[in-house]
Amino acid sequence: MGCVQCKDKEATKLTDERDNSLTQSLGYRYGTDPTPQHYPSFTVTTIPNYNNFHATAGQGLTVFGGVNSSSHTGTLRTRGGTGVTLFVALYDYEARTEDDLSFQKGEKFQILNSSEGDWWEARSLTTGGTGYIPSNYVAPVDSIQAEEWYFGKLGRKDAERQLLSFGNPRGTYLIRESETTKGAYSLSIRDWDDMKGDHVKHYKIRKLDNGGYYITTRAQFETLQQLVQHYSERAAGLCCRLVVPCHKGMPRLTDLSVKTKDVWEIPRESLQLIKRLGNGQFGEVWMGTWNGNTKVAIKTLKPGTMSPESFLEEAQIMKKLKHDKLVQLYAVVSEEPIYIVTEYMSKGSLLDFLKDGEGRALKLPNLVDMAAQVARGMAYIERMNYIHRDLRSANILVGNGLICKIADFGLARLIEDNEYTARQGAKFPIKWTAPEAALYGRFTIKSDVWSFGILLTELVTKGRVPYPGMNNREVLEQVERGYRMPCPQDCPISLHELMLNCWKKDPEERPTFEYLQGFLEDYFTATEPQYQPGDNL
């Protein structure tokens, strides 16, 4: 992790600190969970260690690393001598319950109670109304968190994904916390040239001892706002001047309301099934609404699919898993027929998206990026000592902007159907399952890694069924004898080698999801510097 300087005697060029770990050890530079937040706080979550396949659900491990999704946590401290900290709304919000407070972007609030974590009790200084507001929809007045261009704890790859979204012109930019240097920031800009086409350049913003900021020591600023203003007026050595802040999507809420945060068994009557999205072996998936005003996805399970008691126990754990690459569980109806209420993903399953949707036209960079997103979500599950057990494209959901999220984690363990529990029955996903799991029931995070390798083949073949021409029995026999799928057509050899690593016979020889995330995120950029030098900066 050294400072690399371009030595150009003609024109003084400075480079930002480059993260050499890109070329040293792909995947191992990822530390704490990169879920975007404004003000992170760590919690200690008790989740059973499912990677010990002998353990029961009741055996718990205390796992450090679960990141609370709340933007601002704890009791607010006052500012100056006023005794009041004012917050400003960054987005519009429509109240979902009688306890909520509707508001418009730009409204200012006095916070009355911040003890509920993700939901704060507030008074609007615009309307005088009082009620609960989602804490990640507001920021302190005059803070950088309130700026359109500030994206907080956004990872480098997610920054590129957002900046390269359709419709953003050259010069679209954002500022985020640096992943590699504490207290520093990164400026990410959408650029274009004849060689690369549309791409993103990243510049390190350093902090002075006296509190100022700079990209180059020859241009120092008291505030980030002044730095942005300066480079908005002139490129001054950057790839181009800053033109427009990147559009921020609406923040996701991890609960339906403040009331369902802790009491999330809800009445069936509060749900309306509107449009059936899919039909599976064990139930249906619907687009619906909660309370008539909040769009959700509702999975309805056929009676007898699983024990309501076991489901409720597992749901308690699933509700604690909060990550931007996992489909968020909102609420449940635990009496049969069981309803599982989650966030709604507009493009449906990855399998359908690849076979029949917009995914048919995707090129390799998009497909690798989607794989990286899944690996990132699974790396979180890995850190939390949890297991998916049924990882495949049918259980990955797609949203706008090619956002991918993992669904149905943990549910496979609860299914009581004989055609499934036999593990070699007609309903069991043999072609995605590691041999030690299919033959002996040894499900661990390493059997999930095997399944991820199969999912990679689904991506590059646009949803083709694995092991074409072979039935389940033949697959199990051939895999046990050492057979592995050959490299799919038009798939790079390096990607097939990654699949083969996922399919190692010895589970312990398979890579971690942390490694898979790093490898895939840097797949097309491993030979480029992480941070760009500027021209005459």
From Swiss-Prot:
Disulfide bonds: none
Catalytic activity: L-tyrosyl-[protein] + ATP = O-phospho-L-tyrosyl-[protein] + ADP + H(+)
Activity regulation details: Inhibited by phosphorylation of Tyr-531 by leukocyte common antigen and activated by dephosphorylation of this site.
Domain SH2: from-to ranges: 149-246
Enzyme class, UniProt record, top EC level: transferase
GO CC term (a single one): plasma membrane
Keywords: ATP-binding, Developmental protein, Kinase, Lipoprotein, Manganese, Metal-binding, Myristate, Nucleotide-binding, Palmitate, Phosphoprotein, Proto-oncogene, SH2 domain, SH3 domain, Transferase, Tyrosine-protein kinase
PROSITE patterns: PROTEIN_KINASE_ATP, PROTEIN_KINASE_DOM, PROTEIN_KINASE_TYR, SH2, SH3
UniProt xrefs under Gene3D superfamilies: Phosphorylase Kinase, domain 1, SH2 domain, SH3 Domains, Transferase(Phosphotransferase) domain 1
Residues that, per the record, bind ATP: 277-285, 299
SH3 domain segment(s): 82-143
Modification sites for Phosphothreonine: 12
GO biological process entries: cell differentiation; cell surface receptor protein tyrosine kinase signaling pathway; reelin-mediated signaling pathway; T cell receptor signaling pathway
Family matches, as SMART domains: SH2, SH3, TyrKc
EC number in record: 2.7.10.2
InterPro entries according to UniProt: Fyn/Yrk_SH2, Fyn/Yrk_SH3, Kinase-like_dom_sf, Non-receptor_tyrosine_kinases, Prot_kinase_dom, Protein_kinase_ATP_BS, Ser-Thr/Tyr_kinase_cat_dom, SH2
One Pfam family of this chain: PK_Tyr_Ser-Thr
Chain positions with Phosphotyrosine modification: 420, 531
Positions annotated as active site in the UniProt record: 390
Residues covered by the Protein kinase domain: 271-524
An annotated Gene Ontology molecular function: ATP binding
Covalently attached lipid (S-palmitoyl cysteine), positions: 3, 6
Family from the record: Belongs to the protein kinase superfamily. Tyr protein kinase family. SRC subfamily.
Protein name, per record: Tyrosine-protein kinase Fyn
Originating species: Xenopus laevis (African clawed frog)
Gene encoding the protein: fyn
